[in-house]
Amino acid sequence: MNNEKEIENLEAYRLKIRKNALIAMGISSAVAFVGLFLFATPFFGWYSEDFEDYKTIFALSFAFIILGITFIFVFKSFFNSRFKRKINEKFKDYFLNMFFKEGYTYDYSKGLSFEVLNQSEILNRPDEYKTSNYFCSRNEGLTFVGADYDLIFYHYYTDKDGNRHRTENHNPGKFYVFTYPRKFNHYLLIMEKNNGGEAFRLPNKKSAIEFESMDFNKRFSVFCDDPAFAFFVITPQVQLNLMKFDDDISSRLIVILKENKLFLFMNNFTSKTKISLFKKLDQEQINKYASELKLPLTLADDMDLEKEKFHNKDFEF
């Protein structure tokens, strides 16, 4: 995938933001330097005789040093975060237009309601729910929506003085749901083992299924109300694709097939695309980002739920 023009535009934007960041960090460094200068003056006799109390000089110097260093890190984090968000939006707009030529809707500030995610039947209700990065598209009768989420659970404890405190356990990730033109009469869950966390639970009255592949069984748990349906959908090739999919992303993977929907959770997702304000953009980063963005579509294609055998009347599925 060659995107030289897009890389040039993004690189020009990076240099512009980096210039502003360096100016802000330079001013912060100057403040810290003033603090160091004040700190050194008593040792070299560079002080007014009116200053009888050296503590005033030291206090002032430490204040300048701490303030300068703090602002260096604050400005670096602020501009880097701003750059990453803007690049993320530009990447998405560029690649989503490439992948979904028939049209799509993307809104960073919007998300999906918890009720949409909860249709998967594997979530515990959180104490707080946050969502953003809403996306929606239709393609050849298939509806595809997604968003980022954070399932937050509160925990309370009392210290030795009797004071009550609250801690928060965050479960961030990405969620996607594909809606197909036809219904599947079974419930199927594929969950990466050691998913952990209190956000997810196992479905009721579903049998655990094991496959011939020992590697797949070690990495994934499969639950279904009909073993025949599970073997029908999760072919050896799908198993290999799921393991590769899991290797390619830093997250805990959960896939659910219910009625006419395919749900995909990428819990605790971390992008492997290392984008920095202070590092030049290159084609490899672009390709990695495009690959991550296309992962849900790749998984849906791998499971091939639109294949002809699902429409054959000889099958009860």
Regions found by a protein language model. Name each.
Residues 44-50, 80-81, 85:
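Transmembrane helix-loop junctions in multipass membrane proteins, especially transporters and channels
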Residues 1-8, 83-104:
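Juxtamembrane membrane-interface segments of multi-pass membrane proteins
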Residues 22-44, 62-67:
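Canonical alpha-helical transmembrane segments of integral membrane proteins
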Residues 46-66:
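Hydrophobic alpha-helical transmembrane segments
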Residues 93, 97, 101-102, 108-155, ...:
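Charged, low-complexity intrinsically disordered regions
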Residues 37-45, 150-159:
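Short regulatory "switch" loops immediately downstream of catalytic or recognition motifs
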Residues 15-18, 69-95:
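Transmembrane-cytosolic junction motif
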